[in-house]
Every structure is written in structure tokens, then in C-alpha cells.
């Protein structure tokens, strides 16, 4: 099985725009825990998503309430306890 992957599109947004998260190569029809870390290094409460029958889930992040700066995202496959790599996106004024 391939290592879980997370892709962020786009990687730079103006405050108020959306960021799209695509998670692939997770265990199908199970749960994954998505982590979002603020620019100051503190983490929001993780969000649990259910993967589809291909081991994928997709999520939109609304940047309206996010701070200006660079955020990190990674996702844990709860069935295997394997983490994706960390990916980043930046919110600009």
C-alpha cells in the first residue's frame, strides 16, 4: 500500500479564499484524522474524516477566520497509524 498523501491547492491564498485538501492512499472506508497547525505552532482541534472506497477524502478550508501566515497540514490514517507528510499553505492579506 502506498504511503498516505495530502495535497493542498492552492498553496497561497488571500484571506477569505478557500484552500482545498485532497487526501489519497489512505485505508478505504475507514477514518483519518486531519491536523492543522497555526503559524504560531499551536494546533487546532483535529478533524476526523471518513475515507471513500478508494481511500480518499476531500475537504475545503475557509481561510476567513485564519491568521495571516503559514499553516501546516498532515493527516493520520487511523487504521494504520501512518501519517502523511506535512504540507503547507500560506494565508496573505
Segments (PLM) and residue ranges:
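Extracytoplasmic/secretory-pathway segments with low complexity and glycosylation-like composition
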Residues: 1-93
Amino acid at each position: 500500500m502506498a504511503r498516505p498523501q495530502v495535497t493542498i491547492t492552492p498553496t497561497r491564498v488571500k484571506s477569505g479564499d478557500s484552500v482545498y485538501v485532497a487526501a489519497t492512499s489512505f485505508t478505504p472506508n475507514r477514518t483519518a484524522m486531519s491536523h492543522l497547525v497555526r503559524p504560531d505552532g499551536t494546533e487546532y482541534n483535529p478533524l476526523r474524516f471518513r475515507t471513500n472506497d478508494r481511500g480518499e477524502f476531500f475537504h475545503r478550508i475557509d481561510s476567513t477566520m485564519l491568521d495571516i501566515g503559514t499553516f501546516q497540514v498532515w493527516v493520520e490514517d487511523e487504521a494504520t497509524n501512518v501519517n502523511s507528510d506535512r504540507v503547507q499553505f500560506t494565508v496573505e492579506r
